[in-house]
Regions:
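A Zn2+-metalloprotease active-site environment signal
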Residues: 1-209
Length: 210
């Protein structure tokens, strides 16, 4: 709703003004191409979900990433969209990643995690309208992006439904998981999934007939 959208924009502004995010180096044409491909796919899979896709760059281990913020903001980083030498994604795999993040948006996982990890701070922000103070609390925000296994299952299930709604199989997501697993463990895995639990279990769930 409105307060989540305002809060999400404050969080993005905080990340932009700090050391975490910088402007995307992808060409405007490439950004527009990805956004234009994702928009009708999202509309088919979740016509009731409002989102905003933004592109940013980052350095270090977090550079290969995509994540959702409150209010439907989905951030796609250059390291994932353009490759960083460790992982090269097809456009279908990028759409699967964005579908996964749209699942987090649909199920409001970030706000639910904020309530779980910092319920008092969230309650005070809602009561007093102090979203800026909460948005500036990096520890709280990073905790909210560490999803539970159940939340990841929900987002994976949505990603599969997203792909199928657009005439695709779960293969792009499965292929991505296999690529990441081949990077020889969490010390080399990109941030997009290095913090997501039970990668092998998630592959098996996607392969199971449902």
């Amino acid at each position: 709703d409105g307060f989540e959208q305002r809060f999400g924009q404050m969080v993005l502004d905080q990340m932009d003004s700090g050391d975490f995010l910088s402007p995307s180096t992808l060409s405007p044409e490439r950004q527009a191409q990805l956004a234009a491909r994702f928009a009708p796919m999202a509309a088919r899979a979740a016509p009731d979900v409002r989102y905003q896709l933004v592109f940013r760059n980052a350095d270090g281990p977090a550079a290969v990433n995509a994540f959702a913020l409150p209010g439907g903001i989905i951030v796609l980083l250059d390291g994932l969209a353009g490759g960083d030498g460790r992982l090269t994604l097809t456009d279908e795999q990028l759409m699967a990643v964005l579908g996964h993040e749209l699942g987090h948006v649909k199920h409001r996982h970030v706000m639910r995690r904020l309530v779980q990890t910092a319920g008092t701070a969230v309650g005070a922000a809602v009561l007093w309208g102090d979203f800026a103070g909460l948005a500036a609390n990096a520890t709280v925000l990073l905790g909210a992006l560490q999803y539970t296994r159940d939340f990841e299952r929900e987002a994976d299930d949505f990603a599969v439904a997203f792909l199928r709604a657009n005439g695709l199989t779960p293969s792009p997501l499965l292929d991505l998981f296999r690529q990441i697993e081949s990077l020889s463990g969490g010390d080399r895995a990109p941030a997009f999934l290095s913090t997501h639990p039970a990668l092998r279990e998630r592959q098996q769930r996607l392969q199971s007939p449902r």
